[in-house]
Amino acid sequence: MRIPIIKYEIPIPENVKVSYENNILKVSGPKGEVERKFYHPLIKLSVNDNKIILETYFATRREKRLINTWRSHIKNMLEGVQNPFVYRLKVCYTHFPMRVKLEGNKLIVENFLGEKAPIIKELPYLDKVKVKIEQNKDETEIVVESPDKEKAGIVASMIEQSTRFLHKRKDRRRFTDGIWLYYKAGKNILEE
């Protein structure tokens, strides 16, 4: 069944600038800039009077799902340029002390499960994503921060996956060594 009109208005905050040209929506704010391509022949996106307007006529379920997805992406863009998304990963080891370094765009994990050869993982999007390694007394944390939620999530998952593939050979109840994501874009995963 077709829906005659679907129209959403998303308000733009005061300290955020938005422009839409050539199917690319650019959002810039005090903490950064994010851009994303939005194009569909049946969905119209426009920026008017401090509002982003999404509308479509005679939409099927597919267009309804797509317009709701676009609305979520735009809200994340508006939120990210004001308060960047933060992902926190913890370096855990029980058997062998593991060391983590960041050199350029490469993450180097040394002494993982006592192996001599280090694990080297190239990280994308480091021009738009900040990666910091914080070392306390006994704990090491990796903090990934970006106004773009998708790119921050990709980098955090690549860091987590860099030590995960070796767990196929080990019993995970006994070998908990690795880099584990515990804080994800404003939500503590351990409390859920």
Swiss-Prot record:
It comes from the Archaea. One of its GO terms (cellular component) is cytosolic large ribosomal subunit. Transmembrane segments: none annotated. Keywords: Ribonucleoprotein, Ribosomal protein, RNA-binding, rRNA-binding. The keyword rRNA-binding applies. GO terms for molecular function: rRNA binding; structural constituent of ribosome. GO terms for biological process: cytoplasmic translation. The keyword RNA-binding applies. It holds the Pfam family Ribosomal_L6. Belongs to the universal ribosomal protein uL6 family. This protein binds to the 23S rRNA, and is important in its secondary structure. It is located near the subunit interface in the base of the L7/L12 stalk, and near the tRNA binding site of the peptidyltransferase center. Part of the 50S ribosomal subunit. This is Large ribosomal subunit protein uL6. It comes from Nanoarchaeum equitans (strain Kin4-M). The lineage of its organism: Archaea, Nanobdellota, Candidatus Nanoarchaeia, Nanoarchaeales, Nanoarchaeaceae.
